[in-house]
């Protein structure tokens, strides 16, 4: 069967570069990037060998369009057949799923110390299946999202370790909405492009996070 379209997931895979992809002929070539914030300089070169660029972040989409590429925003968590509202009783006050690295734990500990009940899954051995996670989201009043990148620094090909972190658009925002649950999120410019404050309440500090959580739990 003739192959017409080839997708290349290029992040942190140096061999899938401009020279490798450029040798592939007579197909439509699509570059896919999820962590473009860390490797944009290299990806922007690789993109020159592709026909279309798909980005997890709308900011990256604009960066590629600025360079003349045909680029589109493609959030990977947008399948409503997978992430759906089970209409379960909202018995969990606040849910966080993911790794408790960097200052995430400080934020959550601050909430707990101030009387907020937080359920945590997905850290260390506390894993759940995708179906279990979706049902947990459905039965939660609030999902908590953090936007900072997880590494100690953002290491990319041009800037080395100059930046301590980037604010990323995370999938929890979309997953939560599809499951019928409010997501309260740390600030990121990507989500600011898509959602307003009423759709995704945003915080920058621990005190702001606590105030927003209390406000919505009381309503």
Residue ranges and their predicted role:
Residues 1, 58, 66-68, 127-219:
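Catalytic binding pocket for nucleotide-activated donors in carbohydrate/polymer assembly enzymes
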Residues 1-68, 81-83:
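Extended catalytic core of nucleotide-activated donor transferases of GT-like folds
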Residues 11-14, 35-39, 59-61, 77-81, ...:
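Short, solvent-exposed loop/turn segments at secondary-structure junctions
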Residues 28, 52, 70, 93, ...:
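Proline-centered loop/turn at the N-terminus of a beta-strand
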Residues 48-52, 94, 199:
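Short active-site oxyanion
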Residues 77-142, 148-158, 163:
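Conserved catalytic-core segment of nucleotide-activated headgroup transferases in glycan assembly
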């Amino acid at each position: 069967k003739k192959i017409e379209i080839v997708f290349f997931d290029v992040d942190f895979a140096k061999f899938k570069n401009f020279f490798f992809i450029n040798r592939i002929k007579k197909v439509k070539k699509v570059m896919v990037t999820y962590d473009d914030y860390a490797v944009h300089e290299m990806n922007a070169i690789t993109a020159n060998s592709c026909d279309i660029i798909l980005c997890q972040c709308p900011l990256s989409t604009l960066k590629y369009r600025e360079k003349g590429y045909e680029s589109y925003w493609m959030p990977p968590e947008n399948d409503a057949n997978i992430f759906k509202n089970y209409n379960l009783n909202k018995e969990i006050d606040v849910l966080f799923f993911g790794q408790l690295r960097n200052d995430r734990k400080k934020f959550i500990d601050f909430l707990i110390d101030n009387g907020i009940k937080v359920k945590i899954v997905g850290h260390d051995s506390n894993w759940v299946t995708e179906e279990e996670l979706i049902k947990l989201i459905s039965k939660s009043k609030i999902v908590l999202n953090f936007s900072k990148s997880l590494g100690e620094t953002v290491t990319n090909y041009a800037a080395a370790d100059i930046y301590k972190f980037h604010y990323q658009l995370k999938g929890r925002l979309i997953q939560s909405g599809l499951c019928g649950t409010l997501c309260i999120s740390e600030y990121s410019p990507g989500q600011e492009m898509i959602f307003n404050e009423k759709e995704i309440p945003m915080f920058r500090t621990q005190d702001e996070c606590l105030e927003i959580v209390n406000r919505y739990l009381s309503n």
